[in-house]
Amino acid sequence: MVNSDIITVGIGDCAIARSPMKIKTSGLGSCLGITLYDRQKKIGGLLHTMLPNIKDAKLKDNPAKFTDAGIEYLVDEMIRRGGSIDKLEAKVVGGAGMFENSRLNIGERNIKSARETMKKLGVSIIAEDVGKNYGRTVIFDTLTGDLLIKTILKGDKLI
């Protein structure tokens, strides 16, 4: 969905925008919100992933659902639209453990997958707000590269 200056990204989706646009996603529990930003070109992308690895999936039709494949897809799209791989900065938010006693540990596995994939691609993660047990909404500012994290009970934070 596009508002005059904010693009909203749903679960298993991503968007890329140039300054001064903002990109927003909500409902980050065990899911991850991952931003990539090229500070020189003022281009940024936001990805909302659900699951850690595409290799474990029966349906592989949407790479943005998966942390590993989604990051690779977003990096490729950022480069295709003028970003430089050596200039990309990443921020990672979410990966909460929303349910006690969950043996699936989706949040933890998403965080691990993001870190491993970024390392493999040579992209630096410059900030994180991950884990814990609460949901988050993020608003990414492509003018500054700032990421506003909103929570219901924990307040707002800028990374």
Curated annotation (Swiss-Prot):
It comes from the Archaea. Keywords: Chemotaxis, Hydrolase. GO terms for biological process: chemotaxis. InterPro entries: CheD-like_sf, Chemorcpt_Glu_NH3ase_CheD, Cytotoxic_necrot_fac-like_cat. One of its GO terms (molecular function) is protein-glutamine glutaminase activity. Its EC number is 3.5.1.44. It catalyses: L-glutaminyl-[protein] + H2O = L-glutamyl-[protein] + NH4(+). The keyword Cell cycle does not apply. Belongs to the CheD family. Probably deamidates glutamine residues to glutamate on methyl-accepting chemotaxis receptors (MCPs), playing an important role in chemotaxis. This is Probable chemoreceptor glutamine deamidase CheD 2. It comes from Methanosarcina mazei (strain ATCC BAA-159 / DSM 3647 / Goe1 / Go1 / JCM 11833 / OCM 88) (Methanosarcina frisia). The lineage of its organism: Archaea, Methanobacteriati, Methanobacteriota, Stenosarchaea group, Methanomicrobia.
